[in-house]
């Protein structure tokens, strides 16, 4: 039985994190298939049809299509699909949960500017 994992993010070959993700893909073995999906790629809205078993939202925010990223996170959460968000991926998961579950008008300081509705503050790592 193989597992199919979507790695969602805007691939940047000069990013150390993205280079390591690519290296990890090479050693996962035949039972794990990974599919890199850019945030502007229409496949981001067809994860169920693609038979995706897990979602890894890669570092690299802000993303080219924030709305598509939030839709993918919501799909994974609502369908019980394992989800891992690293760096910006986790930050966007906080935004998605705050908006759709808590009903907050949550924003991200690095995308929307510092304000009273920030669920994610400016971070030193960014």
Mark where each language-model region is.
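N-terminal beta1-alpha1 cap of cysteine-dependent amidohydrolase-like domains
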Residues: 1-126
